[in-house]
Amino acid sequence: MSEVKRNISLRNSTNIFTSTFSLSSNNVPKPLIGESVIKYGDEAFVYGGRDALNAQLVNDMYVVDLNTCSWKQVEYQGNQKPIPRYFHSGDLWNNKLIFFGGMGFNDDTKCLYVLNDIDIYDIETKQWSHIPGMITENQTNDDAKEVNGSDVDEKSKHLYPSARYGHLHCVLDHYLIIFCGQDLSNSYIEEINIFDLDSGKWVFKSLFNHHCGIYRSNCVVINKDSEFLQMCRPINTTQDSNEHSIGSLFFYLNYNFVNVKRQVIYLELFELDTAESEKKSAALAKDNNQSFRFLELDVTEKFLSSAMPPGLRFPAVNILGDNLILSGIYLTSSRQAFVLWVYSLDKELWLQLDMLGVLNHGSWFKCLVLDCTNRFVVFGNKTRKLTQDYNLRQSNYDHIVFIELEGYGVYRKPQMGRVTERSEQLGKLLLNGISDMEILTIERMHIPCLSRMLYKRWPAFQKIMDRAVEKNQEAFQAEVSQLGPQLTDLPFSSIHSTGSRALYMPYSFETCSAFLHYIYCGTLNGSYCTAKNLCNLLILCKGFEGLETFFAYIVHLLHGVLNRNNVKLIYETAALTGAKGLQLRALRRIARIEQGGTAISPTSPLPNLDD
C-alpha cells in the first residue's frame, strides 16, 4: 500500500510542473450560463450568457490576457448594441467576432425565444453590426419579431436557418457554417446552414440527419496540412473538375452515457468554381444550394483503440499537431471531474492525460488550446462543486489552469519548409563541392563550406560577419592610434572583410557537420540523430541567432529519441536551453523510472502518452 501511495505521490508531483494554476485579476466576469468563449491570439473573449446570480441575460463582453490572467470589460463604440443572448455560438473571422442564434428574453412578456440573427463585433473599431434573421416555423411567439424582423431578400428566404440554440458551428474560409442545435421545445434541428461572411447572405441550407447539440457533441476544423486528412479522406474521392474543397472538419458525438455510444464523422465542403456557379445560378436563380456539396463519411472505426474515452457532457474537440484532444465533464457516482483524452495519430490510441489532483477537484468548464505554445487552458473555480455548477450549466472564471501539453508528448510539429528529394541531393552535392571558407571546430578540425549558402539559409550569419568586421575595424584603429596622433586623423576606409576564411564554432566536428548538413539540405539524416548529438545541436541553436526554426526541429527530434537511457541527458539539456515542454516530458519519464520502471498498459484507467 505504501508503494502505491509513493507512486501516486510521484505522479502528482510531476503534474504540479505540467500544470500552472493562476488566479484571475481585475474585472473578472461573474458566473455565467450559456456564454461563448473565443480565442484571439494570446487573449480570449467571453461574451453574453445569463448572469447565474440574478438570471438576467447580458450582452457584456470581457477579454483576458492569457499571459497575465488579467481581465477587463470591453467598452463598445458607436450606437449599435448587441442583443443579449445565451447558448449562442461565437467564431473568429478576419478580426471580427461572429455571434449567431441562441435564446433571447423579453422583459415585458417574460418569455424566452430562439434567434437566427447575427451580431458582428469588430475588434479593431470596437463597433457592432447586426444582420437580422427571419421568422421561421419554430418561432411561435411575437417576441422574435422584434429582433429578427421581416425585411429579408425574398429570393433567399428558403435559405434562412431555423432559429436555434445549443448548435455546433465553425468557420471554413469565408463561410460561417451552422449545424443542428435545438428549438424552443428542445427538439433537435437536422440542418446544415452556410452564411457567406463576405456578402453577408445565407447561401446554403440542407438536411443533416444527426441529432447534434453542445450537450453531447462538438466539431473541429481540420487544417489542410493535417495528417488527419490523409487518415480520413478516401483515396478515390471523386471531385468534379469545376469544384474545389473549402475545408474539412470532424464531428465527435457521444450519447447513452450508461452504455456509451461514440461516433466520429468526417465532413468536407466543396464549392463550385465561380464561372460554373454563375451558370447554374442563372439557370436556377432561386436555388443557391447548387453551389455547394458535402462529403460525409463515418470514420468511427478509425478511432477505435483498446482504451476509449468515457461519455463526456459538453465535450470540446481540438486538434494540435497529430493529436485530437477531447475534453469535457465526466460524471459518475464515484467520480466527478473535468477530463482530457487524446487520440494520438502516431500511436493510434486513445490515451488519457494524467491530471490527478489538478482538475479532479473544483468546477471547470470552458476551455481552449493555445497552438503556438502547446498549452491547454481551462477556466473555472477550484473551490466550487462540479456537480452543482453542471446542474446549473454555470461557468466560472475566477481561476485559470494552464496545462503544458508538450509535457505529455502532445504538441504541434514545427513548420519546416518542404524538402524534396531533389533539393536534398543538390544540397549534398554542394556540401561536398566548392567552398570559400571553413568552419573551425572545438577539436581544431576544418570543415569546408560555401559562405553564400550560409548567407542565404542562415540570415543571422550576416550579423555575425558584420560584428567580426566591426571588431577588426576597432582593433585596426587601436593599433593605428599607438603609432601617433598624426595617423589617427587620416581618412582610412572601412574594412569590409573579416580578413579570415574561418568561423570558429565551439562544438564537436560531428555537431558542426550536422549543422552544415541542415543548412545545405534542410533536414538531418539518421546518422546525425543520436541523443548526444541532438543535445549538442540544441545548445548550438541557443548560442547563435536566427536558428529558432532549427531549435524547434531539434526539440521535435529529441521527443522522438527520448528513452530511459538518455532521459537525464535530455532533461539537463532542455533545462539549459529553455525547452520547457521537452524538459517536463523528460521529468515525467524520470519520475516513472523512479516508480520502478513498470509500464502502465494501454488498458489501464490512466494511461499516458509516454507508455
UniProtKB/Swiss-Prot annotation:
GO cellular component term of the entry, any: cytosol
One Pfam family cited in the UniProt record for this chain: Kelch_KLHDC2_KLHL20_DRC7
InterPro entries: Kelch-typ_b-propeller, SKP1/BTB/POZ_sf
GO MF, any single term: peroxidase activity
Keyword field contains Phosphoprotein: yes
UniProt keyword annotations, A-Z: Kelch repeat, Phosphoprotein, Repeat
Lineage top rank: taxon: Eukaryota
GO annotation terms (biological process): cell redox homeostasis; regulation of conjugation with cellular fusion; signal transduction involved in positive regulation of conjugation with cellular fusion
Kelch repeat start-end pairs: 43-91, 96-149, 175-224
Alphabetical list of Gene3D superfamilies matching this protein: Kelch-type beta propeller, Potassium Channel Kv1.1, Chain A
Residue positions where Phosphoserine is found in the record: 604
Free-text function comment from the UniProt entry: Essential for mating and for recognition of the mating pheromone, and for the determination of cell shape. Implicated in activation of the ras1 protein.
UniProt-listed PANTHER family: MCG48959-RELATED (PTHR43503), NEGATIVE REGULATOR OF SPORULATION MDS3-RELATED (PTHR43503:SF2)
Name of protein: Protein ral2
Organism of derivation: Schizosaccharomyces pombe (strain 972 / ATCC 24843) (Fission yeast)
Higher taxonomy: Eukaryota, Fungi, Dikarya, Ascomycota, Taphrinomycotina
